Amino acid sequence: MATKFQEGGQLEAQRSRLGPPKMYKVVLLNDDYTPMDFVITVLQRFFSLDTEQATRIMLKVHNEGRGVCGVFPRDIAATKVEQVSAFARQHQHPLACIMEEN
C-alpha cells in the first residue's frame, strides 16, 4: 500500500515493503487407536498427497511419533489443523494435528 509524504511542498509515494509471511508446519501426532488407512485418507484429502507420499508420512507418524504434512502460512496452517481435527472427531478418531513455527 502506498503512503504519501509531504516534503517541502511535494508529495512522494513510498511503498511499504513486506517480507515473506512466517511459515508453519502442520504435524500429525501418533496415537494407538487411529487406523493407518484413516491417516492416509486425511493426508490425501486435506494435503493433496498421492498414495505413496501419504503412506510415507503415515509410516513416519507411526514409527517416529510425528510427521510433517506440509508447511504453510499461518492462516492456512490453522485452517488445515482445524479441518483435520474436525474430520477425525467426526469419524471418532483421536488423531491429533498441530502446527509449529517453521
UniProtKB/Swiss-Prot annotation:
Residues spanning the signal sequence: none
GO terms under biological process: protein catabolic process; proteolysis
Source taxon at top rank: Bacteria
InterPro entries xrefs: ClpS, ClpS_core, Ribosomal_bL12_C/ClpS-like
Quaternary structure annotation from Swiss-Prot or TrEMBL: Binds to the N-terminal domain of the chaperone ClpA.
Homology family: Belongs to the ClpS family.
Free-text function comment from the UniProt entry: Involved in the modulation of the specificity of the ClpAP-mediated ATP-dependent protein degradation.
Protein's name according to its UniProt entry: ATP-dependent Clp protease adapter protein ClpS
Name of the gene encoding the protein in the UniProt record: clpS
